[in-house]
Amino acid sequence: MAKAEKVTAVAEIAEQFKSSTATVVTEYRGLSVGKLTELRRALGAEATYSVAKNTLVKRAAAEAGVEGLDDLFVGPTAITFIKGEPVNAAKALKTFAKENKALIIKGGYMDGAALSVAEVEQIADLETREVLLAKLAGALKGNLAKAAGLFNAPASQVARLAAALEEKKRAEGGAE
């Protein structure tokens, strides 16, 4: 690879680091091209699975301000650049790694911090953002309905009491 190509490659990888919400570093030793294609399909449109030379990736990470990943760039390494929801891509990687022992998750990077393998797997075990928001909305709606019922109960009780008193007065007034 010529020096100009290396400079261009480093700039492209650095841009991917900067524009990603998260990255996951994997070892792909022993995976066929067909399996890598299958993995890329499983990741979907929100993630890009890239294979590059470790020295170029290290330089790009440093250029992008990504720290703490240098130890992961040993051996055949690939990086998943996640543009959207990190949970979906992490789930896809974890599932694929379970089914294909040749894929090894080494770690990752999200929100300015390096992630261990365990942390990447914890992200994979989370519900998606939409599901969590729906659960929160459901919990809030239920509690708001209970609160509204509590606030409305005294008013309706007072209204029933006033109606009963009025009826009692009419009954007493009609009896006299």
Curated annotation (Swiss-Prot):
Q: Name one Pfam family in it.
A: Ribosomal_L10
Q: What does the similarity note say?
A: Belongs to the universal ribosomal protein uL10 family.
Q: Does the keyword Cell cycle apply?
A: no
- Put simply, this protein is called Large ribosomal subunit protein uL10
An example GO biological process term is: translation
InterPro entries, sorted: Ribosomal_uL10 (IPR001790), Ribosomal_uL10-like_sf (IPR043141), Ribosomal_uL10_bac (IPR022973), Ribosomal_uL10_bac_type (IPR047865), Ribosomal_uL10_CS_bac (IPR002363)
Give any Gene Ontology cellular component.
Answer: large ribosomal subunit
PANTHER family from the entry? 39S RIBOSOMAL PROTEIN L10, MITOCHONDRIAL
Q: How does it assemble?
A: Part of the ribosomal stalk of the 50S ribosomal subunit. The N-terminus interacts with L11 and the large rRNA to form the base of the stalk. The C-terminus forms an elongated spine to which L12 dimers bind in a sequential fashion forming a multimeric L10(L12)X complex.
- From the Swiss-Prot or TrEMBL record, what is one GO molecular function term? large ribosomal subunit rRNA binding
Q: Which UniProt keywords apply?
A: Ribonucleoprotein, Ribosomal protein, RNA-binding, rRNA-binding
Q: Which SUPFAM superfamilies match?
A: Ribosomal protein L10-like
Q: Cite the NCBIfam families for this sequence.
A: PRK00099.1-1
Q: Which superkingdom?
A: Bacteria
What function is annotated for this protein?
Forms part of the ribosomal stalk, playing a central role in the interaction of the ribosome with GTP-bound translation factors.
